[in-house]
Amino acid sequence: MIACTATIDLDSSTATLSSRPQPIAFESLQQLKQLMTESSDFVQGDLADFRRAADNVRLAQLATILCATNLGDKWSPEGTALIGINGDGCALNNRLFWDDFISHGHDNGRASLFVPTLPSIPVCEAAIALHIQGPVRYIATESATLLEEAISDMFATDSTLRQIMTVELFNRSVRCALHTKN
């Protein structure tokens, strides 16, 4: 059962939470982060490395914090798993890395562009930001195919899980949902 959702869309510069009727408008991910960290209305996450992260990591971090915020005082990182699923979340980063590699070669290319090309990095960084104390998994599948099976399997095989958060990244947006056992 989906308990709550959150989305961030860079094209419309809005963030939505299922528990709030009005979207949050922002001009940049840095501004959205500032709005969230300066308000006690949001779950506070560890965003110490936010400025150094690629946009796909920033999107995952902020969306999971927004999703957790939907739960208010009921949010807890204990017994929470996080699953990252396909979208096209790393495609832009893959292209940036490849173009830099082709232009500058192995010795002069920017190695820092490599890390965000790994599809598990955004979801792992989101888990760190929320201090999630459960498993983190990346599944390369369409959101409508193996995801529900993976969620059911995780709940069935791990009795300590209370909830599973899913993060689906696209180049300029992210969808996050929190699934509960019942």
Language-model-detected regions and their locations in the chain:
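Conserved "HGTGT" condensation-loop signature of ketosynthase/thiolase-family condensing enzymes
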Residues: 1-182
